[in-house]
């Protein structure tokens, strides 16, 4: 089911005398999610991603804008009429009911022409359980399950109504690191197996990039960039996106462009044709450094971390915004850990320039 958002906006009015002005939680969200794709809404806490999800679900009414499922305008429809499956951050399972009863609950509350026979309800419940691989837990209570198993029950309950769109709100935030990795792989498998158009909300960029077909990066209610995860990582539209994506984080420097060259400190570190003379912010991905004894960029060496397949060189520079520069190089490199300085050349495709307002400045690297 294709999902289309047109100028979707949610504004909360001032709460009362002496309060701050109106809060724009989501501002002019335009987006089309192709049928059967998994899209990650990504951004820091308070950026509007959960509000956007609740607008799609129907739990909130938009201030303006439209929501389409396929060609149907569902903006005015209540949640139960939209055909959505929702999985909340805290799962919202009924503790006194078995897994089977929790999965059946949405079906038992259908009325009128939508009401199903008991046989059909059981069939659907076991089909959903099979998809999430919990058939052997149907007689258990939620308190007897691990966090990952509870998550699967919540997903099965959302799937049992055969929704047109599946919505997941921070579904992994309550799990430990091992279960998060395992469960996000399960979500990807389930989405591919069912083919349901899915919107996944998270503040964890690694989660979003690892399982999403597309990601939407948000800040202060405004969409910053939309695209395939690797595309957004490789070609950030602005400094916020560049800094938000990537682990370790991108290295950010105060720089300037003079005569087609990027200067960081007193060193000309890269040729950047097509850019006017100006002060810039230069951002360099950790993998954008090449160790070179006569390299153009000199930093103070503070440490080396050998990680097996690669090495992280930790350094400092007076023009760097980060507390430490982290440069990832291949394990075949030999770093003199006793040295006080380390020199690099920079990979042009891993260097980004931004203006004072944070917008990307394109440049042509030297041949």
What would you call each of these model-derived segments?
Residues 57:
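Helix-to-loop junction immediately C-terminal to a conserved catalytic motif
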Residues 65-73:
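Conserved ABC transporter NBD signature motif
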Residues 261-367:
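Non-catalytic connector elements of ABC transporters
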Residues 50-53, 153:
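ABC ATPase nucleotide-binding domain helices that frame the ATP-binding cleft
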Residues 42-44:
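The feature captures the beta-strand-to-loop junction immediately N-terminal to the Walker
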Residues 83, 89, 93-240:
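ABC ATPase nucleotide-binding domains
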Residues 63-66, 220, 351:
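Conserved coupling/switch loops of ABC nucleotide-binding domains, chiefly the family-specific signature
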């Amino acid at each position: 089911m294709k999902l289309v958002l047109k100028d979707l906006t949610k504004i909360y009015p001032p709460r009362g005398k002496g309060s701050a002005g109106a809060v724009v939680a989501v501002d002019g969200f335009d987006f089309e999610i192709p049928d059967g794709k998994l899209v990650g809404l990504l951004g820091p806490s308070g950026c509007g991603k959960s509000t956007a999800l609740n607008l799609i679900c129907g739990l909130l009414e938009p201030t303006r804008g439209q929501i389409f499922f396929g060609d149907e305008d569902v903006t005015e429809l209540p949640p139960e009429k939209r055909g959505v499956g929702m999985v909340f951050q805290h799962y919202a399972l009924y503790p006194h009911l078995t897994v089977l009863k929790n999965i059946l609950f949405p079906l038992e509350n259908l009325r009128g022409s939508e009401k199903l026979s008991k046989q059909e309800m059981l069939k659907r419940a076991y089909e959903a359980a099979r998809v999430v691989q919990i058939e052997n837990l149907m007689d258990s209570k939620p308190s007897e399950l691990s966090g990952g198993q509870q998550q699967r029950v919540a997903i099965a309950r959302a799937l049992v109504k055969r929704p047109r769109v599946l919505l997941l709100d921070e579904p992994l935030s309550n799990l430990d690191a091992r279960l998060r990795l395992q469960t996000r792989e399960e979500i990807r498998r389930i989405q591919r197996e069912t083919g349901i158009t899915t919107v996944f909300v998270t503040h964890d960029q690694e989660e979003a990039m690892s399982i999403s077909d597309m990601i939407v990066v948000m800040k202060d209610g405004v969409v910053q960039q939309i695209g395939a995860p690797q595309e957004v990582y490789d070609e950030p539209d602005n400094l916020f996106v560049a800094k938000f994506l990537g682990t370790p984080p991108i290295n950010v420097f105060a720089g300037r462009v003079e005569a087609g060259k990027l200067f960081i400190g007193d060193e000309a570190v890269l040729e950047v044709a097509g850019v006017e003379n100006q002060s810039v912010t230069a951002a360099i991905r950790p993998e954008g450094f090449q160790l070179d004894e006569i390299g153009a960029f000199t930093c103070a060496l503070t440490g080396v971390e050998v990680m097996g397949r690669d090495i992280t060189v930790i350094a400092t520079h007076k023009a760097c915004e980060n507390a430490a520069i982290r440069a990832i190089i291949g394990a075949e490199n030999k770093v003199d850990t006793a040295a006080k300085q380390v020199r690099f050349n920079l990979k042009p495709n891993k260097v980004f320039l931004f203006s004072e307002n944070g917008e990307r400045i394109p440049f042509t690297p030297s041949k």
